[in-house]
Amino acid sequence: MNQVEVKRRQIQSFSYVLACINIWVFGKSIGDNGLGYLAAAVLVFALFWVLTGKNLPDRMGRMLRGRNARGQYRNVSRMRKNMMLFQIAEGLLGTVLCMSLGWILLEKVFLVPYGSMILWILSPALFLRCIQSVFLGYFQSEGSEMPSAVSSVLRQVFFLGLGLVFLGIFRNYGEKVSLLLKRTDFTSMYGAMGIAVGMLLSEVLVLLFVFVIYRGSMAGRREAESGMKGTDSFSSQLRTLLIPMGGDI
């Protein structure tokens, strides 16, 4: 593990500390019931994320780094574009499956009857993260670990700010619903839904961040991609990138 990767992991460890702070802040706001609704939905979301693209940046970075070293810039460009198309399709499929099947885990396994609405809000974040993973994988193939590290910190910062904003909006509405239906748990549930909205919008902002960095490096990349042509087919590229991923899942 080189020094750049060590630095990236250290920054990501700091993002985990921020995540714990976020959990504490939101837990104080929505209580045990609301935190339970949110935790169950996030757990199901994480399961689908592991199955779609969690390991892609590291795998893609290692696979493309060797091709960059051999000057196969056209091959790298084709593989990146093909992987983007594949991840878009996989992200859409994962989102649909998470929204349509995730409620079974929530309501039948975890026995959380109101968690489905939270999961439906979170599910589109799968699609956003799948796209992010391709950009981050390409940055790592260029030897740049900082976009992955910085994005992990920004995700928690955005999540805290947006989560608090939408927590207040949704919780106020939940209080009205609770008074109308005489069910106190609706306040916690709607508060958790607001936090989920903040989480989803955080992924949008992180995607915009990595895309801006990607666009900023396009000029130099186009010059490099005029080099050696690649000969790998689309199917061989997918096998190269995806088959080794199973070992980490």
Residue ranges: model-predicted function:
Residues 1-21, 119, 123, 146-150, ...:
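Hydrophobic faces of transmembrane alpha-helices in multi-pass small-molecule transporters and flippases
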Residues 2-58, 243-249:
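Signature of the first transmembrane helix
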Residues 12, 16, 43-46, 82, ...:
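Residue-level recognition of pore/gate-forming positions within transmembrane alpha-helices
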Residues 39-85, 136:
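Small-residue-rich hydrophobic transmembrane alpha-helices
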Residues 93-116, 178-182:
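Short membrane-interface helical motifs at transmembrane helix boundaries
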Residues 100, 111-135, 161-162:
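Alpha-helical transmembrane segments of multi-pass membrane proteins
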Residues 129-152:
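Membrane-interface junctions at transmembrane-helix termini in multi-pass inner-membrane proteins
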Residues 151-165, 169-220:
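Hydrophobic alpha-helical transmembrane segments
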